[in-house]
Amino acid sequence: MNMSTNYSTTNQSYKHLSEAERGEIEAYLSVGLKPAEIARRLGRNRSTITREINRGSITQVKKVNGAKGLLPTLLCRCCSITVIRHAREASYYLKLDSVSDDFMRAFTDAMREKPRVHSVDTFVHTYRLQHVDAVVPSTKTLYNYIHQGLLEIKVIDLPRRVRIRKKFTKRPSTKKHLGKSIEERPEEINNRSRFGDWEIDSVLGGKTIGEPSILTLVERQTRYAVTKKLVEKKAEYVNQAVLECMKLYPIKSITADNGNEFSSLSKIEGLDVYFAHAYSSYERGTNENFNGLLREFIPKGCSLKELNQNLLEDYTKAINERPRRIHGYQSAKKLFELTQTA
């Protein structure tokens, strides 16, 4: 007997079930047809029909002849939802696989750099500009990866996420009268059209008596910051530091809160000083935002006694050199230097 074996090299193709086919499966099951017969009628493999039934079947409690019973029911919509969910789950890994090792290494190094220059958002934007042909995930996608534990970087490695804050308009009355109210501030300061208008604040470490403090000044238009370590949180040290800064930087006005350490600022000649309303830190939002960034390096409750001015300036420099989304991903330092020389 001449026996021969034929091996087919034809590529077999597989096509997912359509919504119409799933509806037909549900209808055929409702009239009692078996999977094999359904497969024959649809021109599908029996295993395909069986898998679809198993994936989309649910058990419902129904009354049959007045008695409760458990009936298996196929919901074609349920099958579709399952397929979509599996596809979405797989897409995370497909996206991650398309990202180069060079990007992931650079991202990990940037997030762990001390002092850190980039946020997740600014790193993504900068890397995309420098590597135009590379596959670069979006900021949102990277945050999703981090929260799902897919990356080496963890949530704890990110001290601050980008937040969108609601702007407040309520202005409570000022109880202290240390000088001119913020309500008297000219529009050119309010709309940031003029260069040289600053916001000022104090950053504390420990809460012990005699603990040093940090004076922070931020230029409103460019968000460029200057910091000074003070021996103590007192008006005399604040005024001394401000006078030193006025010799180095263009300071036309300062907006402060009602803290006692700022009570003598109005005595400085050639300087317009405005005071925000009590309990209204949002009126000095630029300075508050910088203080939050500085807390990455100097956590609350950490004593400032061992902190020296050089290290403080390194921290400030790192923040000033970060690309900022509000500046079209230019740094505050670059804008400050360009505006100062204009």
Curated annotation (Swiss-Prot):
GO molecular function (one): transposase activity
Gene3D superfamilies in the record: Homeodomain-like, Ribonuclease H-like superfamily/Ribonuclease H
Record keyword Lyase present: no
UniProt-listed SUPFAM superfamilies: Ribonuclease H-like (SSF53098)
Pfam families with a match to the protein in the record: HTH_38 (PF13936)
Protein family (similarity comment): Belongs to the transposase IS30 family.
GO process annotations (BP): DNA integration; DNA transposition
Domain of life (superkingdom): Bacteria
CC per GO annotation: cytosol
Stretches of the chain forming a coiled coil according to its record: none
PANTHER family the UniProt entry points to: TRANSPOSASE, TRANSPOSASE INSI FOR INSERTION SEQUENCE ELEMENT IS30A-RELATED
Keywords linked to the UniProt accession: DNA recombination, DNA-binding, Transposable element, Transposition
Function text: Required for the transposition of the insertion element.
Disulphide bridges, residue numbers: none
Protein name: Probable transposase for insertion-like sequence element IS1161
Domain Integrase catalytic intervals: 182-342
